[in-house]
Regions:
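SAM/dcSAM-binding transferase cores
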Residues: 183-239
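Conserved SAM/SAH cofactor-binding pocket of Class I
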Residues: 61-151, 157
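Short alpha-helix immediately C-terminal to the canonical SAM-binding loop
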Residues: 106-108, 178, 182
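Class I SAM-dependent transferase core
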Residues: 1-71, 75, 108-122
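Helix-to-beta-strand junctions that scaffold the AdoMet/dcAdoMet cofactor pocket
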Residues: 92, 164-166
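Short loop/edge segments at beta-strand edges and connector loops
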Residues: 47, 126-128, 198-200
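Short "lid" loop at the C-terminus of a central beta-strand within the Rossmann-like core
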Residues: 130, 175-179, 204
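Conserved beta-strand signature within the Rossmann-like core of class I S-adenosyl-L-methionine
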Residues: 167-177
Length: 239
């Protein structure tokens, strides 16, 4: 392998996490497939290896610093090009992952990736978030739901919390100043059965990239009225 993964390896060490040579090779194959497919399909604006290493791979795996020990099933909602779901599935082969996306051509690409990497712990689902949240196959089925999707916290919570088991967690990857968003989303999170923990703020090592994790505990079942019909959570966020 000609590409240098030392940044990722060293960063993971600072987080007390390790990947085997096989897992690094799986990430490298994923990188190659991502860049190749990106030539004919808009998957990511980040294509330079060093940037992918930091902004996709390290960022996705930064969740290893806070992932609860009791998690066995994970859903990545709005997975897009497979982040954070594919790196997490590589890093955690003993956990079961469901990756959901609304665009079927992205799901088809990710199926190619899953097959090429031999990931037996990944299920791919083509569905809108609102549909998935109302489908009994997925509703309240997961110990942990994660999302790197760009949306306000109220909207993301309406998409994601219906999928979380009572006693489970929703973790949102965020960047930038989120204080106002947090203040505005408190009632929405509570309506959906969640309780927000204190945000976890950090910088990706050796970069000026600041990130935060919003961890929401699922304390009670989400009312049947949520998620609302397709398009409504984004147009009219709960407050």
């Amino acid at each position: 392998m000609s590409r240098d993964y030392s940044y990722l390896i060293n960063t993971l060490k600072t987080w007390n996490f390790e990947l085997s040579d096989k897992q690094i090779n799986q990430l490298d194959t994923f990188y190659e497939m991502l860049i190749e497919k990106n030539k004919v399909m808009n998957l990511t604006a980040i294509t330079e290896f060093d940037e992918v290493l930091v902004k996709h791979f390290a960022d996705s795996l930064s969740i290893c610093t806070i992932i609860p020990d009791d998690v066995k099933s994970v859903c990545d909602l709005g997975t897009g090009a497979g982040f954070p779901g594919i790196p997490m599935a590589i890093a955690y082969p003993d956990l079961q992952f469901t990756l959901i996306d609304s665009l079927n051509k992205r799901i088809k690409f990710l199926q190619e990736v899953v097959d090429a990497l031999g990931l037996t712990n990944v299920t791919l689902v083509h569905a809108r978030a609102e549909e998935a949240g109302r489908n009994k196959l997925y509703r309240e089925q997961y110990d942990l739901v994660v999302s790197r999707a760009v949306a306000n916290i109220s909207t993301l919570s309406e998409y994601c919390l219906p999928l979380v088991k009572v006693g489970g967690y929703f973790i949102s990857f965020k960047s930038g100043d989120i204080e106002d968003e947090i203040k505005q989303s408190g009632k929405a999170i509570s309506k959906l059965g969640g309780k927000l923990q204190k945000p976890v703020l950090f910088n990706l090592p050796d970069t000026n990239i600041s990130r935060s994790f919003l961890v929401i505990d699922k304390e009670k079942s989400t009312p049947k009225a949520y998620p609302r019909k397709a398009g409504t959570p984004s147009k009219e966020p709960l407050n």
